[in-house]
Amino acid sequence: MDLLNTTFLSIGLAIDAFAVSLSSGFIIKHIKFNKALKIALFFGIFQGVMPLIGWLTGLTFRDALANFDHWIAFILLAAIGGKMIYEACQDEEENKKFNPLDNYTLFALAIATSIDALAAGLGLSVLRVSILLACTLIASITFSLSFIGVFIGHKFGSIFNQKLEILGGITLIGIGTKILVEGLIIH
């Protein structure tokens, strides 16, 4: 696999993290550099490490993991998205809002959006590719798109000033559904 194809793979893998970063930016009231950096680091690191884990796992466990990876991603994203929608429909005083900066939430989102990167790593294990270059490129592109996505999402959240948390929840459920459908079609 050449550098151009690895770059396209990296962009494709980063799209889910970018979409979640947009949703996070909608929700964050007072955006600061360090908040966007935290989100981007979570997504960038997970997207960069998961292909390495997949590559190391190799063909031995590929079939076993492939049978349920899409379900894991769907359940995590649907649960988080559903929670966002539920909380957006509650009174702010009665309900602590969904916090995309919470470490546990970011961990779950990073895992859910990087399942496809794990699968990509499994695929890369059968190709002649520099896994370190691929992981570095995937992490860098995901980090960059996620960082920018937080600010873009925040800008649109400020302009519309509506319950965009619902849109964020729908986005997460949509991403989870896409991953599930793709996984079911492939298997």
Curated annotation (Swiss-Prot):
Molecular functions per Gene Ontology: manganese ion transmembrane transporter activity
Main location: membrane
Source organism, top-level taxon: Bacteria
Keyword Transmembrane: yes
Membrane topology: Multi-pass membrane protein
Residue ranges crossing the lipid bilayer per the database entry: 8-28, 39-59, 65-85, 106-126, 131-151, 166-186
Pfam families listed in its UniProt record: Mntp
Tagged with keyword Transport: yes
Location of this chain's protein in the cell: Cell inner membrane
Function: Probably functions as a manganese efflux pump.
Family, per entry: Belongs to the MntP (TC 9.B.29) family.
Official protein name in the record: Putative manganese efflux pump MntP
Lineage: Bacteria, Bacillati, Cyanobacteriota, Cyanophyceae, Oscillatoriophycideae
Name of encoding gene: mntP
